[in-house]
């Protein structure tokens, strides 16, 4: 293994990026609260001498690392943007101005102009919301278990759509748009399945994050919105919710292959440049 690794210690997940013996970019992922597993992995890879670390849990993780490593700190968004720029180049995208929406535990949104960036805002709604509400409503709290269920679940018995409100009357906007997330739960007596509840939770998160991103994009007249974050990893249903809503508003959504690892990639590149 190479001597340098990049770590993005997030609120829920900790991602590690490094170049393997074949010089291929490689990733590891741990739950951030399982810090003993992270430390064990680092210690078991004897060649590691330098660590560039970023993310909200970086200070806590540093306290557990011994003095045998050279530690470099990097601001979270500087690392994320460097990783995003790297992936954009690898995927042959030529986009200079875009909205960058990072769906982690919560969601942060930035304007990016070439290599300059300005924080637009954010929301506490994100991957942590999916996991928290899933735990409260279905007692399922592992993301790997949630995702398959969202694929088979239906939101029809829980969400109120525009069409539900207008009935057969011509509505001013698309009948399929959500008028109220979980609105039917208060007015019906249905026994909803876990898959339906989880699909509806994910719909709520996807629509809130997308609506906020679209508002910022419209304000600055920006066409492209890049959505990244571990919440999107292997989450086809959430990507579909986001892309459909984004395209409905005449904006272009982009999902990067390794977008959830952007922070770790940026940290690695910073230490190896």
Swiss-Prot record:
Record: active site: 76
Root EC class: transferase
Pfam families: Fumble
Alphabetical UniProt keywords: ATP-binding, Coenzyme A biosynthesis, Cytoplasm, Kinase, Nucleotide-binding, Transferase
Any one Gene Ontology cellular component term annotated for this protein: cytosol
NCBIfam families: panK_eukar (TIGR00555), PRK13317.1 (NF009842)
InterPro entries xref list: ATPase_NBD, Type_II_PanK, Type_II_PanK_bac
Assembly description: Homodimer.
Family per similarity comment: Belongs to the type II pantothenate kinase family.
Keyword Magnesium among record annotations: no
Superkingdom of the source species: Bacteria
EC number: 2.7.1.33
Sites where the protein binds ATP: 8-15, 105, 127-131, 143, 230
Function: Catalyzes the phosphorylation of pantothenate (Pan), the first step in CoA biosynthesis.
Gene Ontology molecular functions: ATP binding; pantothenate kinase activity
Compartment annotation: Cytoplasm
One biological process term in Gene Ontology: coenzyme A biosynthetic process
Pathway given in the UniProt record: Cofactor biosynthesis; coenzyme A biosynthesis; CoA from (R)-pantothenate: step 1/5
Reaction catalysis annotation: (R)-pantothenate + ATP = (R)-4'-phosphopantothenate + ADP + H(+)
PANTHER family in UniProt: 4'-PHOSPHOPANTETHEINE PHOSPHATASE (PTHR12280:SF20), PANTOTHENATE KINASE (PTHR12280)
Name of protein: Type II pantothenate kinase
Keyword Acyltransferase on entry: no
């Amino acid at each position: 293994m190479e001597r340098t690794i990049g770590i993005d210690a997030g609120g829920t997940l900790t991602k590690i990026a490094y170049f393997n013996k074949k010089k291929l970019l490689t990733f590891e992922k741990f739950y951030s609260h399982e810090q003993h597993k992270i430390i064990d992995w680092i210690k078991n890879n004897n060649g590691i001498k330098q660590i560039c670390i970023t993310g909200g849990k970086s200070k806590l993780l540093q306290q557990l690392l011994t003095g045998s490593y050279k530690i470099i700190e990097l601001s979270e968004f500087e690392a994320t943007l460097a990783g995003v720029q790297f992936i954009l180049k690898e995927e042959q995208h030529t986009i200079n101005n875009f909205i960058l929406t990072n769906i982690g535990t919560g969601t942060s949104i930035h304007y990016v102009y070439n290599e300059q960036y300005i924080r637009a805002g954010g929301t506490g709604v994100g991957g942590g919301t999916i996991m928290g509400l899933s735990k409260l409503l279905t007692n399922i709290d592992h993301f790997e278990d949630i995702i398959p269920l969202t694929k088979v679940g239906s939101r029809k018995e829980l969400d109120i759509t525009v069409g539900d409100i207008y009935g057969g009357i011509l509505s001013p906007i698309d009948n399929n748009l959500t008028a109220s997330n979980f609105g039917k739960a208060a007015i019906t007596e249905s026994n909803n399945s876990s898959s339906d509840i989880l699909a509806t939770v994910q719909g709520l998160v996807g629509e809130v994050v997308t609506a906020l991103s679209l508002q910022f994009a419209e304000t600055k007249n920006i066409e492209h919105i890049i959505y990244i974050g571990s919440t999107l990893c292997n989450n086809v249903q959430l990507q579909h919710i986001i892309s459909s809503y984004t395209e409905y508003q005449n904006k272009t959504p982009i999902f990067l292959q390794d977008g959830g690892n952007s922070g770790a990639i940026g940290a690695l590149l910073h230490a190896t440049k």
